[in-house]
A protein has these predicted regions:
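Structural transition elements
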Residues: 240, 364-410, 430-433, 528
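Alpha-helical secondary-structure segments
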Residues: 63, 143-152, 194-200, 204, ...
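Surface-exposed binding/hinge segments that line
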Residues: 129, 148, 156-221, 244-246
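Gly/Pro-rich hinge or "lid" segments in bacterial periplasmic/extracellular proteins
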Residues: 98-103, 184, 200, 204-270, ...
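N-terminal lobe/hinge region of extracytoplasmic solute-binding protein
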Residues: 47, 65-121, 235
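Long beta-strand-rich cores associated with HINT superfamily self-processing modules
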Residues: 560-585
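Extracytoplasmic/peripheral linker and loop segments enriched in polar/acidic and small residues
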Residues: 48-50, 55, 188-190, 357-360, ...
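Extracellular/periplasmic solute-recognition and catalytic clefts
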Residues: 168, 243-254, 276-335, 358-359
């Protein structure tokens, strides 16, 4: 899951890189590990027991702040964590993730459907029964026609996950080829009299219910325009509705007047009366504003140089929570210099994952990552090819130190030494600090390297589009739901590479038949035990890292800063701070 900028061709002028500032920042950061470790220990209590709704805390305005907006309001297109987590209190799908704290939040539960169906026909057929009496925020009843239209709309609007999540539906192949004429004929059948929706698959999908729980499969009215609605809100089913949006300044939500709670674990009634999201406040200023109570929550990553202050003075307002997320360097395997595997391996050897940990805030909230699967997920990476003394044929158990000599040797062997390389980063404090270090590293191993910071609002779609000829970039990714497929298949699956598109999350343009075969078997073979499935993902992980289309850097926890007045801090494993359940009065 990544920031989804508004579509635009206006890219800021590259900023000048100052190596001295990078070194000074790293020197400062060396003092942080003990502080952040203490912060993690102090600020991470055990999840609270979920309690019945407490009407005394109903009301008030929840005030959120971010440096930039998150792009389109279209829930079937937006792929930013910033808005996906917000949309969780606005929209609903047939299924959802359980709205409880702790590991149980990874469980799928029925949402607009009455119950979870048992797959039939060897995992090829799912029959859902729609709940009665649910209305959209415009008063319109939710019908089976809305469900069918919403599933077709995933393909018609070019949802970023249309291919990776929903291509198993019968008829999806034609929809992916010609979205405008998508019908999903034979794939989606409705029976209005029985309130049932039947979905047929061409192959089993062991994670299909999880994919239906993801935001891109939410149910919207059948007459919703079949294109990106941009800044125009779509009627919704959840406890809140989107009311006003200016991407430069504000996003406003208020209560959905037609919402009546049907399941507290699927979509609980909310506490705040309104939610106000303010944009244009830089991350440094946002920290101060939340500390002072001007806002209740900041969406941006907390700058490294403020973590010590939070650990010393604001521990009650600072919350460290696990989240399957990583920083990484995708390298374009189709253009020089990284169309050479040795050049890509050189980057993996040369990068100091310890430095990246420090730039993010220290070992209390981040850890080196050698492969594609963070430690909180099944089939977590358990090897390290690219550390001093190791190789793809003689792996280590964990990362120890960079090997610059090996990296320089590989650059020379690749014949790419001296080539110009431009690193694209977002212009946030953390990304700029990391990016500055990576630029210096690229220079050190033999390239003419420069850094090009781009607005955080634009960077993610920019690096996805092959027309921009991005060689290497620094970006982040977090799980849409708890599965290794979210990192291996999403980021490197052949079906997720779409040249000349802003929606091509396979940024390296990597496609390997052997890797894809392993991933497809892990996703579709319902006869496998969990252990056997994990083994397939681990095999894919090792094959991927031997080819090095990506240099994983760190896995990171989430550090959440809230105001002193915010009560009932409610964190779910999938949607993080769950906005409807916090108290502001």
């Amino acid at each position: 899951m990544q920031p989804q900028p508004p579509k635009t061709t206006n890219v800021p002028t590259p900023a000048r890189h100052h190596a001295g500032k990078t070194l000074a920042t790293l020197a400062f950061a060396l003092a942080l590990p003990h502080t952040t470790a203490a912060l993690a220990q102090q600020a991470t209590p055990q999840p609270q027991q979920d309690t019945p709704y407490q009407a005394a805390h109903k009301g008030g305005t929840l005030r959120l702040v971010a440096s930039t907006s998150g792009g389109t309001l279209d829930p079937q297109i937006n792929y930013s964590g910033k808005y996906i987590n917000l949309f969780a209190v606005v929209y609903d799908g047939l299924t959802t993730f359980k709205k409880v704290q702790g590991p149980e939040g990874n469980s799928v539960v029925p949402d607009l459907a009455e119950n979870l169906p048992t797959p039939q026909d060897g995992g090829l057929t799912y029959i859902f029964t729609l709940r009665q009496g649910i209305r959209f925020s415009n008063g319109q009843p939710v019908t089976t026609a809305d469900v069918s239209a919403s599933l077709r709309r995933i393909f018609k609007v070019g949802s970023p996950t249309a291919g990776s999540f929903y291509s198993a539906i019968v008829g999806a192949d034609l929809c992916l080829k010609t979205p405008a004429t998508c019908t999903l004929k034979g794939g989606v059948e409705e029976n209005p009299a029985q309130r049932t929706i039947t979905i047929h698959l061409v192959r089993p999908d062991t994670e299909f219910l999880q994919k239906l729980a993801f935001t891109h499969a939410v149910i919207v009215p059948a007459n919703t325009p079949e294109h990106d609605v941009g800044n125009t809100p779509i009627p919704s089913t959840g406890p809140y509705r989107l009311t006003k949006y200016d991407p430069n300044t504000t996003l406003s939500l208020d209560r959905n007047p037609f919402f009546k709670e049907w399941s507290a674990i699927a979509q609980p009634q909310g506490y705040p009366d309104t939610i106000e999201y303010s944009f244009g406040i830089p991350d440094e200023a946002a920290v101060t504003a939340v500390e002072n109570g001007q806002y209740d929550f900041m969406a941006d990553v907390i700058p490294m140089d403020r973590l010590g202050e939070l650990g010393n003075r604001y521990t009650a307002q600072t919350h460290v929570r696990p989240h399957a997320a990583m920083y990484f360097l995708p390298m374009n395997v189709n253009i020089p210099p990284f169309n050479n595997v040795k050049a890509r391996q050189a980057v993996n050897y040369a990068v100091s994952r310890k430095a990246m940990v420090i730039f993010y805030g220290g070992p209390g909230i981040a850890r080196p990552l050698c492969g594609m699967v963070p430690s909180s997920l099944p089939a977590a990476t358990n090897f390290c090819f690219y550390t001093k003394g190791a190789s793809p044929t003689a792996s280590a158990l964990q990362w120890q130190a960079p090997d610059l000599a090996k990296a320089r040797q590989l650059v020379q062997e690749s014949g790419t030494a001296g080539q110009k390389v431009t690193l694209i980063t977002a212009n946030t404090s953390v990304d700029m600090a990391m990016g500055g270090w990576v630029r210096d590293m690229l220079q050190n191993i033999g390239y003419q390297a420069s850094i090009r910071p781009i607005s955080n609002t634009l960077s993610m779609t920019y690096v996805q589009n092959t027309a921009n000829k991005v060689q290497i970039s620094l970006t982040t990714w977090s799980a849409d739901y708890p599965s290794p497929s979210n990192f291996l298949d999403d980021l490197l699956g052949c079906e997720n590479f779409h040249p000349n598109s802003d929606s091509s999350i396979n940024i390296p343009g990597f496609c390997n038949k052997q890797v894809q075969s392993l991933m497809d078997k892990a996703k579709t073979d319902t006869t496998l035990t969990p252990t056997q499935t994990e083994d397939l993902w681990r095999q894919a992980d090792r094959l991927v890292m031997a080819q090095s289309p990506i240099a994983p850097l760190i896995e990171r926890d989430t550090v959440v800063l809230t105001s002193a007045r915010l009560g009932n801090f409610f964190y779910t494993t999938v949607n993080q701070l769950f906005f409807s359940q916090v108290w502001v009065r």
